Amino acid sequence: MTDAMFSSSAKPHFIKPMLPGFETYIVIPKAFYSNYLEGRQEGNAAELRSDATEITWKIKIDGRRMTKGWEEFAVAHNLQVDDILVFRHEGNLLFHVTPFGLSFCEILYSQRDEKDVKDTTGKVTRSRTVKKNGKNECSSVDTDFVVPVTASNQRVDSFYLPRGFTTSSGSSKLCNEIILIDEKDRPSTLKLRYNKSSNRFCVSRGWRAFCCRNGYRTGCFLRIILVRKGKTPVLRIFPLERDEDNIEKHSKKVKQEVEHEESVKEETNVESGKLKRDRLLQKDPKNLCSTSQDTNFVVPVTASNQRHDSFHLPKGLTTSSGLSKLCKKIIFMDQKGRSSILDLSYSISDDRFTVRRGWKAFCCRNEHKTGCFLRLILVQNGKTPVLRIFPLERYENSIAKNSKKIKQEVEYESAKEEKNLESLSLSDNSSFVVSVTVSNLSEDILHLPIRLSRSNLLDKKIHEIVLMNKEGRTWILSLKYSKYSGRFRITRGWKSFCEANGQKPGCTFLLKLHLSMTRFDQDGVAWDKK
């Protein structure tokens, strides 16, 4: 039954926004023209019909233009700038035209015999009326309406259904879910909530992901058909043909209109999110986790974890934070207090958690691009952990924006390191210079000189190294050897060590390796590190 209802409405469409100068002619979109009309319209006239009248209007087609006869059609339907027309192709050169207002509700026409006005040419015009009350507005499009994909509804991940949908669709105001079916018959379940003040339903939590999945970009218009009522309504969605020449101009104005209404809602959500967060931190301090290395860590936004829509949490988070291995969901809270629920899974073989299904959308929503580094803080433990996320503070100008820049910086620091070694004239392979840089802090990795590997002073099977400062405090860090580069690198702890000792980018250490101890000097001060 669903397919039958859809197939009856899924005829070729294209839309035309009425821009200044539309009165004399309109241009058929190039894509629609080449697919359905090219080579068939020569010497013929298109026929236009509408629900406003039983008249069939004959319009001359000159290439892609509808010219002679179009002005009469526009005057008879009292078309105005910013109106939107949906042309449904009925076959041959016959089109059914449906006018929509700026709010994307169908314009209703009423015949007023006593007010019909005849102009000097003897043509009769009709008075256009758009009903304002909530019960009648959009009455003819309550179950078949058009929704624009705008920058604002993508940013807030939601859009509003027409007011008439509330009553005529038979949907209960208690409905909390709705199913969207795309062109490939793939269903997506989204959040549905009723706004009492505006008497409208709002679709949220999944709208942006749905558009991204189907390639619907800002400026697209989607025809939405209600194909099933009930506790969980079902909507069928397919795109209308776009006018590549004019729709971009019109979408900017649409964006401004819709953005004004939704910006107020967004600001309200931000404030309420901050209040909820503050109450959470004050109400139950026992559940707050410490800002140790394992509950306060850095995650890079990479092309790989964006492509796979997932990333791994540090292994230490499994034990030190007491995170339950049975957790299935995790909440990310961004800088504005907005929450996103993502899937969480635990791998026994790796002994670590993986966040998936929503990571890519979260980054897109907050404009975290590839090359960014995010600080994640575990602020609440329990059945559904809560992580606060914000971009890592940048030293100097900014953190490296992509892996190429990081690589260049590492190579530069390596060259600088070699120069420092030459100036120090250290012939002993057990002594070498290391520098604190933006890149090795961001990556939490310190690459040791290659000559340390060649000197065979360190066993390549060693996996840990102990650093000891002048006060005798020690840090156990991971040590790995790369066969590919032939170098040792210190990982998982280098950044914490530097922060604990107040070392920032630009500091330089003279490292001295002893039998079971590594000794560092900084500005003449001895630092012993095992």
UniProtKB/Swiss-Prot annotation:
Subcellular location: Nucleus
One annotated GO molecular function: DNA binding
Gene3D superfamilies, alphabetized: DNA-binding pseudobarrel domain
Biased composition (Basic and acidic residues): 254-276
Record keywords: DNA-binding, Nucleus, Repeat, Transcription, Transcription regulation
Keyword match Heme: no
Main subcellular location of this protein, as a coarse class: nucleus
Presence of keyword Nucleus: yes
PROSITE patterns registered for this protein in UniProt: B3 (PS50863)
GO CC, one annotated term: nucleus
DNA-binding region in chain numbering: 11-103, 144-241, 296-393, 431-530
Protein name: B3 domain-containing protein REM-like 3
Organism of derivation: Arabidopsis thaliana
